[in-house]
Amino acid sequence: MDKFSWTNEELSALRSLILDHHKIVIFPHTAPDGDALGCTLAWSGILRQVHPSASVHVISPDVVEDYLSWLPHLDELQIYSTDPKHCLQLISEADLIFHLDHNQCSRLRHPDLVMAAQASQAARVLIDHHLDPEPGCDLVFSYPEASATCELIHSIICALGWREYITSELATLLLIGLITDTGRFMYSHLSPHLFRTTSDLLELKADYPCIIDRLSYHNPERHIRLQGYVLDQKLELFPELRAACITLSQEELQRFGASKGDTEALVNIPLSIEGIDCSCFIREDKTQIKL
């Protein structure tokens, strides 16, 4: 039994929106991670099969980090930061827009991109697992109890009767979202449904060994050197609070030539220390402090 409480009416409305429209745009959030890319690329792959006469475009606000550059179907991605004119044209022509793995348009980051998405006359659908989705979408599938948006997308695909369209590559995309958003199934936000989803994706021939190999054994040298610096110089422990904190400034990030992907898992490292239950990572970006 599915743990998500959508209605048959909502599923019927979603099916109709998809099949009645022909120019579809799908957005992940800015600086897309494994869940954002996995769910958007997998969803676009499904839509292309069930509605072959439609044009389906995934528009990422930013380039993809190196650690995800091997993902299947990545060549289908449109990158706003490298070709804004083309992406804005696709948005202006769209009659259906999907917002996946983000709860508000501002998470597209680029002002012109945000404005184009908000000004579009297209029907809009939000599918996400973050709290407090902004109003304005025609259909909202917001379930914070989900471990990842890829978990939601898999459930929606199956509920629509489209499981047969999940190829091995699409299953791999959905599994990468589950693995990365749960810290390889180590975070507390886990559920039996998550593992049933994982089991089904493996049955559908998701390439689990490839995912683990790419995430574990293909790190650039700068990633390892940054990690060593953080552990030696930047890790602060607060045993009385059972907590740890890591901070990195812009100068330090630039010194190592680090990208966002190089800092992705730093916050998890202190949790392997006996007596530490809480870990915080604070990064200075160009325009904000990221917690």
Give the positions of each predicted feature.
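A short helix->loop->beta-strand "cap" motif at the edges of active sites that frequently abuts
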Residues: 51-54, 119-123
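Short glycine/serine/threonine-rich phosphate/pyrophosphate-binding segments
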Residues: 34-40, 105-110
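Hydrophobic helix-and-loop "lid/oligomerization" segment in the mid-to-C-terminal part
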Residues: 2-28, 38-67, 71, 76-79, ...
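Short alpha-helices
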Residues: 127-197
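Generic beta-sheet signal
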Residues: 59-61, 80-82, 100, 127-129, ...
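Short glycine-rich anion-binding loops that position phosphate/pyrophosphate groups of nucleotides
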Residues: 31-32, 102-105, 130-132, 250-251, ...
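Short, conserved loop/helix-junction motifs that constitute active-site signature segments
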Residues: 90-92, 113-122
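N-terminal glycine-rich phosphate/adenylate-binding segment common to multiple enzyme folds
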Residues: 102-115, 134
